[in-house]
Amino acid sequence: MTEVTNLEIEMIQGPFNSISTQVFVRANPTGFAEDNLAGQSAWQADWRIAGQISGPYCVHSETLPAVIAFQDQGDGAGLLAAARIPDPCAWTARLPATYKVDVELTHAGQRRQQSQHLFTFRANEIRQNSFYQTDLNGNYRRWVLRCVQHPLDDALSDGGEQFREEGLVCIVINPTMEQCNLATLNGVVILSIVQQPDIEKTISAVKELAVWGCVTACVIVGDVEIKDTDLNNVRIPVGCRVADVSESLPAWAQFCIVDVASLSNASAFVDGQQMPVIVSDIQPFEDCRAARNQCAVLQKNVAAEGDYAGYCILTTNKD
């Protein structure tokens, strides 16, 4: 009998609109012991993936969750099932809608693995040199990020209310899965700083963060050389810090963060970027309102140089 141990389950968001969208669950074929498949695919060897998705759930609003079963998609690379969700709700800070996905793997009708996952529909994306949010009806609005480096646990102490009221994004270095879960449920948006010692751990961290609705984007820092192909199929914007504006940006970067002190020498650099540019500064602040004000001051101070995709207030300078 073919054995399988803790197969990785991938959840995929299909194209969406306000009427319906599809969600796919997939078990990677590399998780099966190929020598036990006797040249067959996992599906031909009588493995199946099934389950259901329920939701939306939201702590800030009353919802009427629906339950939709996943339908097997037949033979192919790995195991794949799909469910069509009516009236999908995208995750936002104001309305942090989540879905529960229950998945089970069976062999010859016998359950071999069972797991539950949190799923969210993303409503933000990059277009040209800005971030945008959609209402799922095909309407997009430009979203200027106003980010502050702040302890996430403190931001969540009041259920994220102050961060939501001020429209702030919380900059967090290597957030834990528990923190991401709480931020997703409570509506606190995170800009994650990914700082890992090697390529493998960096890519793994980005992929783990990409499943959380609260993580709007990741910024990779440190001396790791990543190929653009390493981040294929990652459903989240990935950017970099710019230490030297005279150097080329990595091919994988979809946006960048530039220190305000470099702007006077970076006009040509900024004008030449076909991607969002976020300006950062190091300033103290006492609370969320003061942090939001610091973002406004930074925006005003650099208005002559350009209209940027976002403004970050840091408490330390993370390279």
Annotated model-derived regions:
Residues 1-319:
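Secreted/periplasmic carbohydrate-active enzymes, especially glycoside hydrolases
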